[in-house]
């Protein structure tokens, strides 16, 4: 989130140590970059002389590996799909239940001709059972794990969790679609397996006009996730903080809950593995990272270097050119995955609030459950926002 919205914001100074400081890097799993390296990234010259004996040995190993893994038939497309998550009620679910072959095959069942798994869809009307509502006080807070995959499905992949920070006032279909677009690109382009996704709404200390109270925004996010997804969750920790929380510290919170307290995710071999945590954001956020005196360099290095960023391009934006021109972002470019929108969707929460104030329809811009919640509590009706914020906002 934009640090300038913090009530006590001061432009960061060079070499300034922010408080509280980011977590030590040794507490964050070293899963490597999200984008695979290419030849140009290696130190050795491409056309340097090579040892013929070593080349023959490597070629022999590759040939043996290929022959041992040869398949007698081409698998159907449906067999390539693996369930992302199952909705379980506790972390103590037995290994037999969580890893049964029959249960896995049921989850893989396709829905019509769509490339959507049953495990990705929650019932559109009934709120799933065993959902723990997020607390309204920090004393009652519990980290949500009810949809966190307990065990990796693919032994060749590494676990990854997606986190989206934002105001979500209100949450829209674009916010939900961003997770699905990121999921597609990660599955297709990387060596990671997504084991969960989280919305993290900002606290009431975020100084932006048009924000509904934090507990309303958290509840709307919960309704959107509960009724449309079975792998997305809402974490209220950031919204319950008494002061503005820097994005770097929010990612540290997820690392603490998942990797330090829980030891990561179980692998196919039964061992625990650290989970890579990545920030999901729109192109407008990455552009704000390039503005001088907005983000501290230490936070940018921490977010982009130790965690990583998934950037969904907006209409008309050119994130790649922007990365090329910014020193810190270019340094960590291998840990930034740019997600191209194949069907452009620029639904804006700011414009949704404007429509509500004007008595216009917001049907098909938000989940029905969120629309009903807004109507029930009369949210956004009597609010006003600066004209410039309405015209310029991409959030």
UniProtKB/Swiss-Prot annotation:
Question: Where does this protein hold ATP?
Answer: 175, 209, 350-353
Which region ranges are annotated with the description Disordered? 1-34, 62-102
Q: Which UniProt keywords apply?
A: ATP-binding, NAD, Nucleotide-binding, Nucleotidyltransferase, Nucleus, Phosphoprotein, Pyridine nucleotide biosynthesis, Transferase
- Indicate yes or no for the key word Ribosomal protein: no
Q: Describe activity versus pH.
A: Optimum pH is 6.5-8.0.
Q: Which CDD domains match?
A: NMNAT_Eukarya (cd09286)
Query: What induces or represses this gene?
Result: Expression is slightly induced in late log phase.
EC number(s) recorded for this UniProt protein: 2.7.7.1, 2.7.7.18
Other known facts: Present with 1430 molecules/cell in log phase SD medium.
Q: What is this protein called?
A: Nicotinamide/nicotinic acid mononucleotide adenylyltransferase 2
């Amino acid at each position: 989130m934009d640090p300038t919205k913090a009530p006590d914001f001061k432009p960061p100074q060079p070499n300034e140590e922010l408080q509280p400081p980011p977590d030590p890097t040794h507490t964050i799993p070293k899963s490597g970059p999200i984008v695979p390296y290419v030849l140009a990234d290696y130190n050795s010259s491409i056309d340097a002389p090579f040892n013929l004996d070593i080349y023959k040995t490597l070629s022999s190993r590759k040939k043996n590996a290929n022959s041992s893994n040869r398949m007698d038939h081409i698998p159907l497309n449906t067999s390539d799909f693996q369930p992302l998550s199952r909705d379980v009620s506790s972390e103590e679910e037995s290994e037999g239940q969580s890893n049964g072959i029959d249960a896995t095959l049921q989850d893989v069942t396709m829905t019509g001709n769509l490339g959507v798994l049953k495990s990705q869809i929650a019932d559109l009307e009934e709120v799933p059972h065993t959902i723990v509502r997020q607390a309204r006080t920090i004393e009652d807070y519990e980290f949500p794990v009810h949809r966190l995959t307990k065990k990796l499905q693919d032994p060749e992949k590494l676990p990854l969790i997606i986190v989206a920070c934002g105001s979500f006032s209100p949450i829209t279909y674009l916010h939900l679609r961003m997770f699905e677009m990121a999921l597609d690109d990660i599955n297709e382009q990387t060596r990671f397996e997504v084991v969960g996704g989280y919305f993290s709404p900002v606290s009431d200390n975020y100084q932006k006009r048009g924000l509904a109270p934090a507990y309303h925004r958290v509840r709307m996010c919960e309704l959107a996730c509960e009724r449309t997804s079975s792998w997305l969750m809402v974490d209220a920790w950031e919204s319950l903080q008494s002061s503005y929380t820097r994005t770097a510290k929010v990612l540290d919170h997820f690392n603490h809950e998942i990797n330090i307290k829980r030891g990561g995710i179980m692998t196919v071999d039964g061992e625990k593995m650290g989970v890579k945590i990545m920030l999901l954001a729109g192109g407008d956020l990455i552009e704000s990272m390039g503005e001088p005196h907005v983000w501290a360099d230490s936070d940018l290095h921490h977010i982009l270097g130790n965690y990583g960023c998934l950037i969904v391009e907006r209409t008309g934006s050119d994130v790649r050119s922007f990365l090329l021109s910014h020193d810190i972002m270019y340094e960590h470019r291998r840990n930034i995955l740019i997600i191209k929108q194949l069907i452009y969707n620029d639904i804006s929460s700011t414009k949704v609030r404007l429509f509500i104030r004007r008595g216009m329809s917001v049907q098909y811009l938000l989940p029905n459950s969120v629309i009903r919640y807004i109507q029930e509590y009369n949210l956004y009706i009597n609010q006003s926002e600066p004209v410039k914020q309405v015209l310029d906002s991409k959030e």
